Amino acid sequence: MSSFDKTMKFNFSDDSMETNVNEVLITVHDALQEKGYNPINQIVGYLLSGDPAYIPRHRDARNLIRKIERDEIIEELVKSYLEQHKEA
C-alpha cells in the first residue's frame, strides 16, 4: 500500500491554538477605544449579531475576535462576572 492510500491525521497543539479570551477582549477594547467607538456597545453588538463589522480591523482586532466562538466569549464573561460578584 502506498503512502497516498493511507489516511493522514492532522493534530493541532492545544497550547499553540489556544486563544486567550481575556487578551483578545482587551486588545479589541483598546482598538475600539483608539478608533473613537464605545467599546462595550460595539462588543455587545458583535456578540448579539455575529456581524464582524462591529469590530474594526485596527490592531487586527476583527481577525482576533473571530478566532474565538461567540459562545466561548460569553461563557468567559459570565464566569468572570460571577467570580467577581460572588458573596463570600
Curated annotation (Swiss-Prot):
Family: Belongs to the UPF0297 family.
Stated name of the protein: UPF0297 protein BLi02868/BL02032
